[in-house]
Amino acid sequence: MNKKANEQYKSNERVILDVFTRLLEEKDLRKITVKEICEDAHINRSTFYNHFEDVYGVLEKMWIIHEENMKYIFRQSHSSSKKENLRMILEYIKDNELFYRVSFHSPIFSKISSGFEIVFISHEISGTCLKEKYEMEFMKQGFLMTISYWLDNDCNLSVDDLLDVIDT
């Protein structure tokens, strides 16, 4: 692919992601259609399908982007404090509240669930023995359901208050 075509490809993908994000602010994920994305993005359906299989594929791509952003935040933080790392994650989630609220109730939730293992693997539980694996899964699921509840309630607790709940 030549440079100009590659730039056009990336530009189309950005437009699709932007339109999708705007539509998420306006309506439920299940009501967003490929046709609507294409019309709002001023692209052909074939262009959409060159990038994504369906609407959930767009959401999945957004998850990949958010997961990379979160990993970047972890790499940039030279903190070994579990509490500080959790604070950074919670702030990132709150800054991207709409995306996470939608994602927690979508088919990509299993990807999100596995993506959050970074929170627990990099700290005191390494998951090397069977008991530790159960402990890690318990903590991860409790963490995710608490985050889901927080998102469903419009992040009505401050990050610090939620951190106190999670870190007890």
What residue ranges belong to the model's regions?
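C-terminal peripheral helix-coil segments that are non-catalytic and often amphipathic
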Residues: 149-168
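Short, hydrophobic secondary-structure boundary micro-motifs
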Residues: 32-33, 101-103, 112, 159
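N-terminal intrinsically disordered/low-complexity leader segments
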Residues: 1-9
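Cytosolic nucleotide-binding catalytic cores of signal-transduction proteins
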Residues: 24-27, 40, 122-127, 131-134, ...
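Generic structural signal for secondary-structure transition and capping sites
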Residues: 29, 95-98, 125
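Hydrophobic alpha-helical connector segments
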Residues: 74-101
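Amphipathic alpha-helical packing segments from all-alpha helical-bundle domains
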Residues: 105-145, 168
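An amphipathic alpha-helix adjacent to DNA-recognition modules
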Residues: 10-21, 25, 30-34, 39-42, ...
